[in-house]
């Protein structure tokens, strides 16, 4: 894959080999691949998934003291995924009757690395029972490896469903999220069915795991049908402004494109704003995640489609994982939540039904 740096954005030449894309998540177990390799995980994963969907059942053991939980999230963005996630987590913990103390820090994705490092070290210093974090960058990975090998704090990794192969034998307590690859495949299927057979462009997140899982997977799937040549791809700063600026460049350099595939909410909304200003709303653009801001943009016709996460399920899953752990039950290594494809043509009734399901705790 040829890459060329253009400040402040990264433009990637549209020369992607299918081999390169197949290796986009090298070093990780793809979710289906993981279940095939470790079939004993499938029944426990299915039981856990049903527990997440079910109404809460109270903790069955007595607690000597509250559990201490530290949460470090990249929550300062337009996407409300992280804020809703922690709200659903707390409400499910309360419903389960678990006594807990929570320390949480929201940072900006791709920016506040120093703040993240300080918060993470404080979590270990305070001897948290559970640390909830994410894995996107090399810095994240190095810290996680430090925790895995030198701390008794149990680690729950959020927003990732592909276990790291190198950690086999010393894995985190659990990976919880929505399978980025599967979401990308759903959007690829939508574009293959509905987009004009023209070149397209990709707006990545910042460099890291999410861009690989969402972006490279999508490109690989589109390459397979041969009707949609990739015109250009940009890494962004994971912000609305960087998505806006990249889209202006895309349309200037490749005015013939039929759609823009965006890898995240903030980036998608920036792209939609640029297309509106350029009067190029003939170019399709998607959201990614289906949070409140995206659903509003879909209703206005500013976005064409999104994959909507059943958002609160991952917050519920974190609470249920802690409950199972306190009760001495075996916890599955991975929980992967459900998606629904939503388009601007969908009825208000369907959107309302999906919102009631996705935000069942966080909208209370």
From Swiss-Prot:
The record ties this protein, via InterPro entries, to: Peripla_BP_I, SBP_2_dom
Subcellular location field: Periplasm
Q: Cite the entry's keywords alphabetically.
A: Periplasm, Signal
- The residues forming the signal peptide are 1-22
**Which Gene Ontology terms of cellular component type are present?**
periplasmic space
Sorted alphabetically, the Gene Ontology BP terms of this entry are: regulation of DNA-templated transcription
- What GO molecular function annotations does the UniProt record carry, in alphabetical order? DNA-binding transcription factor activity; transcription cis-regulatory region binding
Record keywords: rRNA processing included? Answer: no
Q: What is its main location?
A: periplasm
Q: What does this protein do, in the record's words?
A: Binds to the signaling molecule autoinducer 2 (AI-2), a furanosyl borate diester, (3a-methyl-5,6-dihydrofuro-[2,3d][1,3,2]dioxaborole-2,2,6,6a-tetraol). This complex then interacts with the LuxQ sensor protein.
Instruction: Give the family per the record.
Output: Belongs to the bacterial solute-binding protein 2 family.
* PANTHER family assigned to the protein according to its UniProt record, in alphabetical order: LACI-RELATED TRANSCRIPTIONAL REPRESSOR, RIBOSE OPERON REPRESSOR
Protein name, please?
Autoinducer 2-binding periplasmic protein LuxP
Organism this protein belongs to = Vibrio cholerae serotype O1 (strain ATCC 39315 / El Tor Inaba N16961)
